[in-house]
Amino acid sequence: MADNLCGGLPPEVCEQLNKEEQFIKIKLEKRRYGKEVTVIEGLGDDADLKKIASELKSKLAAGGTVKNGRIEIQGDHRERARDLLVKLGFPESNIMVIE
């Protein structure tokens, strides 16, 4: 199926093209009792959200989950999450941090 979408390109090239087409939003939400949660949206259904979330949680030393097609990380990690997503191959120009 992926071959049809990518015109016969190798899977690595197809994956990189998918990353470049995504527009990612990173924002902070306040939860009960003033708890802060960093929310990362726009990674799309094609991205392996659980793998990305696991990598972010490990690097940020924070808990988190994948819910409704978005990654939620406990605490305010907007800037560091952006830097880590860039290291994972997502273009910095497609990542917007909402203050």
Swiss-Prot record:
Annotated Gene Ontology MF terms? mRNA binding; translation initiation factor activity
Q: Which domain of life is it from?
A: Archaea
Organism expressing this protein natively: Metallosphaera sedula (strain ATCC 51363 / DSM 5348 / JCM 9185 / NBRC 15509 / TH2)
Q: What is this protein called?
A: Protein translation factor SUI1 homolog
What does the record list as GO biological process? formation of translation preinitiation complex; regulation of translation; translation reinitiation
Which Pfam families does the record match to this protein?
A: SUI1
What the entry lists under InterPro entries is as follows: DENR/SUI1_TIF, SUI1, SUI1_arc, SUI1_arc_bac, SUI1_dom_sf
**Keyword Acyltransferase listed:** no
